[in-house]
């Protein structure tokens, strides 16, 4: 669940958390556990950037590393928002952890090349821990599964490491975003996909991560397990009678089983596996295709983790 800064602070120092209150209330009534992403700059959900316009006089310059010394006013506002959110919701028993940023130090998709510095993110983590020292801090990062993505991610974050590396340094719980198959581009009726789940050469980073967690006694979760299509458009297509190649229903089960197998092979465990794409399952069901919801129900009924 996300605390979207520009939706809550619509005017300077004027906070309206009504929508988030409603979501937390609903989850709590249903007996669910919540990882609340406090942002503040980056939160999941397109466009993954939710800074209020009144805190950003001009767009962040492309290619820069956003640092405390260069954006002091923005950082002060961000820390104030984070503290306000944690103070407001730390009394909610349903909240089990706070997530700081979303893929914190990686570039913002393909749209923007600026990045947050590790020092910036550390100040946000410190603010969360100061406001609530009782709950763990989660930080997530994208796990590359194809050679082109792995090389691009390494190149763009080579100065301070990617979000998984920074999460290992700063977080209590490291979250893995796992999307093994996604579209690269589409021309007419033809789509080019990157598919790397079975390529041995791309497994080293994952093995290192699980080995590190086991040796250091650290906690791992899958914060985003691909459970909806990732096509060459923003909104996943919903074609009647067909499944998109990037994630048909059976792929959800394969993704889950693969991640559980990784943990088992490393003599480790995953604290949680979060399926990413529930809105899509409901959209498919409303279109007469219940296979996505059926796949989730099968996993929940058969898995020892459920």
Positions of predicted regions on the chain:
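Hydrophobic faces of well-ordered beta-strands that scaffold small-molecule active sites
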Residues: 1, 34-38, 96-100, 137-139, ...
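Aromatic-lined substrate-binding rim segments of carbohydrate-active enzymes
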Residues: 1-60, 110-140, 188-215
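Active-site beta-loop-alpha junctions enriched in small/polar residues
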Residues: 2-4, 39-43, 100-103, 142-148, ...
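Conserved, mostly hydrophobic/aromatic
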Residues: 27, 85, 98, 128, ...
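Substrate-binding cleft of secreted/luminal carbohydrate-active enzymes
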Residues: 217-306
């Amino acid at each position: 669940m996300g605390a979207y800064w520009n939706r809550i602070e619509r005017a300077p120092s004027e906070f309206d958390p009504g929508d988030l209150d409603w979501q937390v209330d609903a989850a709590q009534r249903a007996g669910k556990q919540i990882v609340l992403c406090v942002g503040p700059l980056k939160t999941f959900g397109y466009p993954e950037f939710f800074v209020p316009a009144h805190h950003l006089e001009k767009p962040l310059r492309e290619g820069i590393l956003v640092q405390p010394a260069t954006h002091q006013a923005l950082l002060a506002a961000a820390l104030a928002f984070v503290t306000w959110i944690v103070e407001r919701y730390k009394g909610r028993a349903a909240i089990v952890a706070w997530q700081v940023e979303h893929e914190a130090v990686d570039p913002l998709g393909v749209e923007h090349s600026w990045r947050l510095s590790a020092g910036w993110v550390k100040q946000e983590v410190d603010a969360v821990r100061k406001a609530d020292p009782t709950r763990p801090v989660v930080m997530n990062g994208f796990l590359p599964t194809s050679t082109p993505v792995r090389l691009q991610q390494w190149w763009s974050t080579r100065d301070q490491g990617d979000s998984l590396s920074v999460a290992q340094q700063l977080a209590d719980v490291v979250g893995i975003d796992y999307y093994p198959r996604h579209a690269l581009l589409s021309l007419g009726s033809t789509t080019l996909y990157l598919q790397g789940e079975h390529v041995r050469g791309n497994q080293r980073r994952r093995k290192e991560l699980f080995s590190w967690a086991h040796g250091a006694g650290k906690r791992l979760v899958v914060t985003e397990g691909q459970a909806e299509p990732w096509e060459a458009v923003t909104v996943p297509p919903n074609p009647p009678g067909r499944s998109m190649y990037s994630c048909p229903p059976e792929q959800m089960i394969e993704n889950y089983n693969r991640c559980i197998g990784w943990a088992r092979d490393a003599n480790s465990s995953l604290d949680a596996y979060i399926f990413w794409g529930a809105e899509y399952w409901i959209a498919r069901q409303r279109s007469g295709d219940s296979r996505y919801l059926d796949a989730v129900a099968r996993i929940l009924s058969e898995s020892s983790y459920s």
